[in-house]
């Protein structure tokens, strides 16, 4: 029963981590979008020039890179969470196997011929 409670606790913590990770990723996306809008508005107010165009291009590339990094981080977080759940399941199975072996050994001690 203790192993089940521990597994339940691990799964609950994992779920909370998933919600926090996705929330953080979404917040990052909103920050990138907000920065892009701000840069666009600043650039629109400065007029046309090669340096303004270069800055706009650099900002766009930087925002695209930031979005890729956020997506990569979210993907890796999901992979880690999956591995954590699989490890918790495996640990529960190993615990059950160890208990069965121990009980069999204890019962065998009482057998005499």
UniProtKB/Swiss-Prot annotation:
Induction: Expression enhanced by contact with host cell wall. Also regulated by HrpRS and HrpL. Belongs to the HrpA type 1 family. Analysis of mutants revealed that the C-terminus is important for pilus assembly and secretion and / or regulation function of HprA. The keyword Secreted applies. InterPro entries: T3SS_pilus_HrpA. One of its GO terms (cellular component) is extracellular space. It is found in: Secreted; Fimbrium. Changing residue 95 to S: Affects the secretion function. This is Hrp pili protein HrpA. The gene is hrpA. HrpA might be cleaved/degraded in 3 forms but it is not known if the observed processing has any biological significance. Keywords: Fimbrium, Secreted, Virulence. It comes from the Bacteria. It comes from Pseudomonas syringae pv. tomato (strain ATCC BAA-871 / DC3000). The keyword Secreted applies. It holds the Pfam family HrpA_pilin. Transmembrane segments: none annotated. Major structural protein of the Hrp pilus, which is a component of the type III secretion system (T3SS, Hrp secretion system) required for effector protein delivery, parasitism, and pathogenicity. Required for secretion of virulence proteins such as HrpW and AvrPto. The Hrp pilus functions as a conduit for protein delivery into the host cell. Also, affects the expression of T3SS-associated genes. Required for full expression of genes that encode regulatory, secretion, and effector proteins of the T3SS.
